Amino acid sequence: MAIVNNHPEETREALLKTDPKISSKEVVIDDRYAAVASEASIQATKASLEAKSHEVTILETKEEAFEFLKNLIPKGSSINNGHSTTLEEIGFISYLKTATEWDNVHAQILAETDFAKQSELRRLKGFTVDYYLSSASAITEDGIIVGCDGTGTRIGAWYATGGKVIIVAGTNKIVKNEQEASERIYKYTLELESARMRLAYKLPGSAVVNYALIKGGNPYSPK
């Protein structure tokens, strides 16, 4: 199937051209953190994650990632997701808008226009789904998944979701260690997210309010 990204204007390539702060060089993006990881780095990271009770699947293309994710989640499951450019770029967010095989809790949350009720719905249903779909800000070669957000909707779900968390990430997220993960976040991810916030919400930028390190999976959780 054709990959459909409903927000092509929010991709890295688009933001580098259209964001006034980035295009004018007022803000400098560290492009080292956009590079695809080497095969050796990918395999080392996979081995480290698996040693820490995570299940890992490596896929070569966006199409493969889309099909794998679609087939991974059992029909009838409740699902939720946070914002993820990766999920957008593989076409999964677009697919969710019309998919009927799952209980899409994220759509139910966004359909609530009252902010207080939406927050309550997010707390009561958003964190109790069977599957929560997300991405990571960085993944270290020694198997640490690093995430951050500004409001707690992503990080909160990582910790509180009653079911399983699925992290979909490109190999450009792989870094050597925690220090490089922090550098990637503050020198790359935050600046691109700030550009997206300026475009999508007319805000001055984003902020790292919550910063999480997942150092291992739950060793007592059933597969």
Each PLM stretch: what is its role?
Residues 1-15:
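Eukaryotic N-terminal low-complexity, Ser/Thr- and Lys/Arg-rich leader segments
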Residues 2, 23-30, 87, 104:
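A cross-kingdom feature marking charged/low-complexity
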Residues 10-13, 31-39, 119-126, 182-184, ...:
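Short low-complexity stretches enriched in small and charged residues
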Residues 11-55:
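Generic N-terminal amphipathic, Lys/Arg-enriched alpha-helix
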Residues 21-27, 73, 89, 161-162:
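Catalytic cofactor-binding cores of redox enzymes
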Residues 32-33, 108-111, 165-172:
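Flexible, glycine/proline-enriched loop segments at strand-loop-helix junctions
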Residues 38-123, 128-132:
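N-terminal active-site beta-alpha-beta segment that forms phosphate/nucleotide-binding
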Residues 126-223:
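Conserved phosphate- and dinucleotide-binding cores of soluble alpha/beta proteins
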